[in-house]
Amino acid sequence: MAGKELERCQRQADQVTEIMLNNFDKVLERDGKLSELQQRSDQLLDMSSAFSKTTKTLAQQKRWENIRCRVYLGLAVAGGLLLILVVLLVIFLPSGEDSSKP
């Protein structure tokens, strides 16, 4: 009877050892996955920083481009109005030659 009890205890100890070894393997596997996940998160952080910098630069370039276009449009409108004003002045203001006729 003591021999059977000893065998049962030995089997239980072997089972516990096997379970512990499986758990240890799972812990090592999980550690590897966590390391890989940490590397990926670091890469994503670097990529997001680069993306943020690029978007800020692009937004600033577009802002200046918009301002430049508005200035050119304003100058074109002012030039057009000036041209219209000159044409109207030439047409409607009497010239010196017309006033000397009897």
Swiss-Prot record:
Localization (cell): Cell membrane; Endomembrane system; Golgi apparatus, trans-Golgi network membrane
GO biological process, alphabetically ordered: cell differentiation; Golgi to plasma membrane protein transport; skeletal muscle tissue development
Membrane-side (Vesicular) residue stretches: 94-102
Keywords in alphabetical order: Cell membrane, Coiled coil, Developmental protein, Differentiation, Golgi apparatus, Membrane, Myogenesis, Phosphoprotein, Transmembrane, Transmembrane helix
Listed transmembrane segments: 73-93
Parts of the chain on the Cytoplasmic side: 1-72
Entry annotated with the keyword Phosphoprotein: yes
Entries under InterPro entries matching the protein: Synaptobrevin-like, Synaptobrevin/VAMP, V_SNARE_CC, Vamp5, VAMP5_R-SNARE
Induction: During myogenesis.
Post-translational modification Phosphoserine, affected residues: 41, 48-49
Keyword Phosphoprotein among record annotations: yes
Superkingdom of origin: Eukaryota
Primary site of residence: membrane
One Pfam match: Synaptobrevin
Membrane disposition: Single-pass type IV membrane protein
Residue ranges of domain v-SNARE coiled-coil homology in the record: 5-65
Database matches in CDD domains: R-SNARE_VAMP5
Gene Ontology cellular component list: cell surface; cytoplasmic vesicle membrane; intercalated disc; late endosome; organelle membrane; perinuclear region of cytoplasm; plasma membrane; trans-Golgi network
Family: Belongs to the synaptobrevin family.
Functional description taken from the UniProt entry: May participate in trafficking events that are associated with myogenesis, such as myoblast fusion and/or GLUT4 trafficking.
This protein's name: Vesicle-associated membrane protein 5
Organism: Rattus norvegicus (Rat)
Gene: Vamp5
